[in-house]
Amino acid sequence: MSRIAKAPITVPSGVEVVVNGQNVAVKGNKGELVCLLNDAVVIKLEEGVIRFAPAEGFKDGWAQAGTARANVNNMVLGVTEGFKKTLLLQGVGYRAQVAGTIVNLTLGFSHPVAYQLPEGITAVAKSQTEIILEGADKQVVGQAAAKIRAFRPPEPYKGKGVRYANEIVRRKEAKKK
């Protein structure tokens, strides 16, 4: 049984939540997010508090209710504070520039890599080797960061590549003769 689903979500001031059947729309100063919940979840909005419970006749009701609660809580946090991912580029000649919604990366290939940011995501190049991605949708921010990292993931021998700011790269020792 999920303990996460039992905890209610208090809606902060300045955030508007609309529940229409299984659709939940959350609107705040950072934007608007919409989510479709599983049929195994019953959602109730009363007096600025959102509560979740499993629907009758579903085997995995509590698990789905816990997932729905986590998703809606991330939506509320996203429209109030937003989410941020920092990427670091390590390697000789590895550079990043941001031009509007396109991130241009020089990662040691014979050609530069241009990544089109998804809608609702903003990028700032703090330096030539640091990119900060920000947005209201946690999943989209993480997915964009993962796609940029996938162009050149950190390799274990020298540590060169694109990494998250808090990522620890496991290093290997070079082969000895």
Swiss-Prot record:
SUPFAM superfamilies recorded: Ribosomal protein L6
Gene Ontology CC entries for this record: cytosolic large ribosomal subunit
Assigned keywords, A-Z: Ribonucleoprotein, Ribosomal protein, RNA-binding, rRNA-binding
GO molecular function: rRNA binding; structural constituent of ribosome
Pfam families, A to Z: Ribosomal_L6
GO annotation (BP), single: cytoplasmic translation
Summary of subunit composition and partner proteins: Part of the 50S ribosomal subunit.
Chain's role: This protein binds to the 23S rRNA, and is important in its secondary structure. It is located near the subunit interface in the base of the L7/L12 stalk, and near the tRNA binding site of the peptidyltransferase center.
Family, per entry: Belongs to the universal ribosomal protein uL6 family.
Protein known as: Large ribosomal subunit protein uL6
Species for this entry: Psychromonas ingrahamii (strain DSM 17664 / CCUG 51855 / 37)
Organism taxonomic ancestry: Bacteria, Pseudomonadati, Pseudomonadota, Gammaproteobacteria, Alteromonadales
Gene (name only): rplF
